[in-house]
């Protein structure tokens, strides 16, 4: 390829990473230009996705392209090079807030229909649903996942260990999960013998056949699953666990993944809320229905709805809700100071973030009195809950992990083409009546998989195509060979879906030379125990997992090792030949935005962006023959190492170095590395003046960046902030701006 293909697409997303991008993008372009590299942007923020979904409601001047769909097509091109930052996986509450903000800016979007009745309302709701939950990743992830802690970051964590609370063998913290009636115990699976088109239907006891999904096209070799969770068993489980927590005096917490599992987990969440506040719902249920209360969206939804009632009625309802707490366990808090509980919103406590944080804190979460306490962590679905209990058991026996000595656990994740549960949203349903749920071949009428379900049960179909499985096995072998680490496939032979995968893994491993490699297949609990026993001895182990465990483990282990998952290197080798580079494995940090608005200090650490950019440049250099890009990559890696060694990352404290200052130091170190490299004298000459200007102005720039802190700022919105105001806030150093401008003139 020629250097004409030297293009990087940098995503514009949400919250803290979007703010950091406003400062970092001009730096990237300054360094990329001399190497002939174009840096384009693609706005996939929740606001842009909403606007892209409703062009027919906008004026010509307001219309924006459907950038997510366009970027999805780009992932299918062999020269794709995409840097993907964390974005909001919008809950219903967040989506409504974003819609209202856009409406307030003059966009005449339709209101979000919470209880759609007419065909028009149902159509609008369907369009909005495409913007909800994890709407971005399934579109872009056309490859499997390779996530690991870069060597420089791991070494920094060893030299500068983050805090880890002590574990006590007397800790009462534990995980509670269902032992029957959940998806694990209600799963059937098969591998398709040929291409098929199937429909999902319910043969009701009433004699009525309801087609829930008329058509899904499947390929030969694809693994499909039919699984259901019993509403009755779920509610009985909640009753038992709430009562147990109350009797034993341990704090109660509920951990779901309502952002990614945007259909099933809000339902699972809502049942718990209703049972916890049963007496209040029994007394006011009819009124709540009239108001359109939907506790699948949390107690915040209930409080919003009752705000329209007379004050006396509001007070009565609140008294009845508070009265429920008298015979209920203490609830874990999201924000003790503000009285925000675990039940406030389903996306406030997300399992892959909340469980590692709890384990890091010695098995404790915050109570209403602002103190850390032992906790019952309720995770209804047993499929993956047991891995957390295994880690808790390990910590109770061995104590807390030591970041100075512990090994590392990279991950190779089966992710491509909406693999497994994370691709099941459009195939997940609440059973409208008792009956038999069938997956039926449209052409022949053959019933492929069948389940007996009851009203309110959650039934879903999952799928994973054969090509991604082959690619996943290949990636695991490659990483094991390149790293010298043992690789463990976390697969449970007693789970039907994973038993089908085990057959394929054993078959496709034969396609590779595995001589001298340590590759094993273990059930999740055994794999966790094996990995932890190595970790505490300072040994490294690759986890090779399905899509959900990819998500969970790439938060769990990095938070133990590094203190955060945002510092992970996350590479998605796209199956069409391109590459996508995700900046870390964490979220988009709304609290960082709050601090910026209140104090003009952004604590977001762009280390993930620095590392992703280096790999992106290296890949671009290899694939296009652009030697200058390779030099940029090597020098950026060196600059990032220097940044860590000199401790120039952002501080959480206002008045100290923040994201903007950290980015300045990265730019200065990068320019210095380029000015001293000798491989390309022309590049050396181009960057030498920039390196000198930045070094000479270090004191002035750092002073200008510090001077603006400590005062509130206006960025003109939250989901749709004003670009000009954001730029003014994020680029406050006139000296730095002038130097960058002169370098690209």
Task: Identify what each model region corresponds to.
Residues 394, 692-693:
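Alpha/propeptide regions of enzymes that mature by internal proteolysis
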Residues 675-678:
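Ligand-binding pocket scaffold of soluble enzyme catalytic domains
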Residues 721-745:
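C-terminal accessory extensions/subdomains outside the catalytic/core fold
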Residues 684-692:
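Short, charged, amphipathic alpha-helical segments
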Residues 2-270, 278-503, 508, 512-524, ...:
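Extended, well-ordered protein cores
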Residues 630, 681-685:
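Short, solvent-exposed positions on alpha-helices
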Residues 702-719:
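A glycine-biased, small/acidic residue-tolerant capping/turn segment at secondary-structure junctions
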């Amino acid at each position: 390829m020629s250097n004409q293909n030297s293009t990087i697409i940098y995503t514009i997303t949400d919250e803290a990473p979007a703010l950091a991008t406003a400062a970092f993008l001009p730096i990237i372009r300054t360094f990329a230009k001399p190497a002939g590299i174009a840096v384009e942007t693609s706005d996939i923020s929740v606001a842009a996705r909403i606007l892209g979904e409703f062009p027919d409601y906008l004026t010509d001047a307001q219309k924006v392209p459907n950038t997510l769909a366009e970027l999805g097509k780009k992932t299918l091109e062999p020269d794709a090079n995409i840097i993907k930052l964390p974005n909001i996986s919008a809950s219903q509450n967040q989506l409504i807030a974003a819609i209202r903000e856009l409406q307030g800016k003059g966009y005449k979007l339709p209101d979000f229909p919470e209880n759609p009745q007419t065909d028009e309302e149902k159509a609008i709701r369907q369009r909005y649903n495409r913007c909800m939950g994890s709407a971005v990743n399934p579109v872009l992830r056309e490859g499997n996942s390779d996530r690991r802690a870069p060597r420089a970051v791991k070494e920094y964590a060893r030299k500068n260990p983050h805090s880890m609370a002590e574990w006590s063998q007397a800790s009462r913290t534990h995980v509670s999960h269902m032992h029957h009636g959940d998806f694990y115990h209600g799963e059937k699976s098969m591998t398709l013998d040929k291409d098929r088109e199937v429909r999902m239907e319910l043969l009701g006891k009433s004699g009525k056949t309801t087609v829930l999904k008329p058509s899904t096209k499947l390929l030969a070799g694809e693994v499909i699953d039919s699984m259901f969770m019993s509403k009755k068993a779920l509610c009985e489980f909640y009753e038992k666990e709430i009562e147990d927590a109350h009797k034993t005096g341990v704090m109660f917490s509920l951990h779901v993944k309502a952002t990614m599992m945007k259909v099933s987990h809000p339902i699972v969440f809502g049942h718990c809320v209703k049972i916890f506040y049963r007496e209040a719902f029994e007394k006011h249920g009819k009124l709540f229905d009239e108001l359109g209360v939907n506790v699948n969206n949390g107690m915040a939804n209930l409080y919003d709805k009752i705000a329209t009632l007379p004050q006396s009625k509001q007070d009565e309802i609140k008294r009845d809700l508070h009265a429920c707490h008298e015979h209920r366990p203490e609830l874990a808090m999201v924000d003790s100071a503000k009285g925000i509980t675990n039940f406030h919103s389903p996306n406030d406590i997300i399992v892959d973030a909340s469980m590692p944080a709890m384990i890091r804190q010695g098995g404790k979460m915050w109570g209403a009195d602002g103190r850390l306490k032992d906790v019952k962590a309720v995770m209804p679905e047993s499929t993956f809950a047991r891995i957390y209990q295994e880690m808790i058991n390990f910590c109770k026996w061995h104590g807390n992990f030591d970041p100075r000595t512990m090994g590392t656990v990279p991950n190779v994740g089966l992710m491509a083409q909406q693999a497994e549960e994370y691709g099941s949203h459009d195939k997940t349903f609440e059973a409208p009546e008792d009956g038999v749920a069938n997956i039926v071949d449209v052409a022949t009428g053959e019933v492929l998989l069948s389940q007996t379900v009851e009203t309110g049960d959650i039934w879903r179909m999952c799928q994973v195509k054969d090509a991604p499985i082959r690619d996943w096995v290949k990636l695991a072998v490659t990483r094991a060979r390149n790293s010298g680490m043992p690789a463990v496939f976390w697969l449970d032979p007693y789970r039907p879906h994973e038993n089908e995968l085990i057959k394929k893994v054993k078959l496709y491993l034969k396609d590779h030379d595995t001589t001298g490699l340590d590759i094993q297949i273990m059930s999740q609990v055994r794999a966790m125990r094996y990995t932890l026993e190595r970790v505490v001895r300072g040994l490294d182990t690759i986890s090779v997992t399905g899509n959900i465990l990819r998500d969970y483990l790439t938060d769990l282990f990095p938070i133990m090792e590094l203190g955060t998952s945002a510092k992970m290197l996350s590479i998605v080798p796209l199956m069409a030949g391109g590459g996508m580079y995700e900046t870390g494995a964490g979220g988009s940090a709304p609290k960082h935005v709050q601090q910026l608005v209140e104090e003009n200090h952004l604590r977001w650490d762009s280390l993930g962006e620095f590392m992703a950019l280096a790999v992106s440049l290296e890949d671009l250099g290899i694939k296009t023959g652009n030697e200058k890009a390779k030099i940029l990559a090597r020098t950026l890696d060196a600059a990032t190492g220097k940044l860590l060694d000199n401790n120039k990352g952002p501080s959480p404290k206002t008045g100290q170095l923040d994201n903007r200052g950290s980015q300045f130091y990265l730019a200065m170190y990068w320019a210095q590395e380029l000015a001293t490299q000798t491989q390309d004298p022309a590049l050396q000459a181009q960057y030498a003046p920039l390196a000198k200007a930045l070094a000479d102005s270090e004191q002035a720039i750092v002073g200008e960046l510090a001077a603006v802190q400590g005062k509130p700022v206006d960025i003109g919105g939250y989901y749709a902030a004003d670009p000009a105001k954001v730029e003014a806030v994020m680029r406050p150093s006139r000296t730095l701006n002038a130097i960058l401008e002169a370098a690209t003139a």
